[in-house]
Amino acid sequence: MSHLNQKTLPVSVITTCFGRNAHLYNLLSSLAAASAVPSEVIIVNDDSDKDVLASYPLTIKQIPTKSTATDGRFDIGCNRNLGAAAASNEAMIFLDVDCLVADDFIESLFERMTRHPTALLMGQPRYLTRPLSKIESRQLKQGKLAMATLNRLSILNPYRFNFTMQSYDQKDNDDKGIILTQDYGAFWSLCFGIYRDQFKQIGGFDTAYIGYGAEDTDFAFMAKKLGIAFYLTNDLVYHQQHSVHRPSINHLNSIVVNANRFYQKWQHWPMSGWLSEFAQLHLIEWSAAQSTAIKIQNTPSQADIEAAHQPDAPFI
């Protein structure tokens, strides 16, 4: 919902995308309609319409994507680092382009960041069960799409930690809306806040991870190694629905490369659920106890990839 007494806060919102402009525009609509807006929104993106970007009452800084690879692949970690380097504020909130922010997300997460300035804080996602209609996207841009509608259209991911719905209304009792955790594997870079000093201390996202998988877990493991506290919060975002593959065999190559990179660095296997599924499909030979690099045994056929495609799934 739009707010008459909207605040502007000294925080930079950073997002990056390619080929997902409908989601990007919805994200910008939600930011513009929130109770408080960031003083700048940094978009690492090459293909969005500058005239459309100019239509939002936000200070938007668009910077071009760059890739660490020579083949021009979209490297989300590298692009997040570019966004952080371009940020004018010390406080930074990173959002996947799939996000819509709740009315008070920016205001509440920023306030919590100011009270925990040396920590890593992550928000709470809900998952839309279908894409927004054109009418709903228009209402969102007009500040007329109620959060009750987004709550009705969304669900929680039962495989991740979730706050109860009651906790969303208990911002005044902060003990119920923020939890210090040692489970750094629960970190997901969909929606998180961090100050520049801690981001630099971590080293940003490791750009040795190419393509899909493990770069956010690596980021969290480095935070843990450095003693940076990690908080889960009930600050709410809505993940816009898009098709997925179950299992993610369309990303087999990059998942294996990144899993090997992660194990070499941390002596721990990330993405064990996916690796287990790949092993059951005889695509790889892998067990949680192994210490040797994973090798691809079989490549999925196009028919296999199409069979794994789930166009209506809310999450992987």
How does the language model describe each region?
Residues 1-30:
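N-proximal low-complexity "stem/linker" segments adjacent to membrane-targeting elements
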Residues 29-38:
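Short, acidic, metal-binding catalytic loop of nucleotide-sugar glycosyltransferases
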Residues 69-87:
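Glycine-rich, basic loop-to-helix element that forms the pyrophosphate-binding segment
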Residues 92:
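Short aromatic/hydrophobic "clamp" motif used to bind/position activated sugar donors
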Residues 104-150:
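Conserved donor NDP-sugar-binding/catalytic core segment of glycosyltransferases
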Residues 142-184:
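Short, flexible, basic/aromatic active-site loop/helix in glycosyltransferases
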Residues 200, 207-210, 220-238:
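Catalytic donor-sugar/metal-binding loop of nucleotide-sugar-dependent glycosyltransferases
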Residues 231-249, 262:
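Active-site donor/metal-binding and catalytic loop motifs
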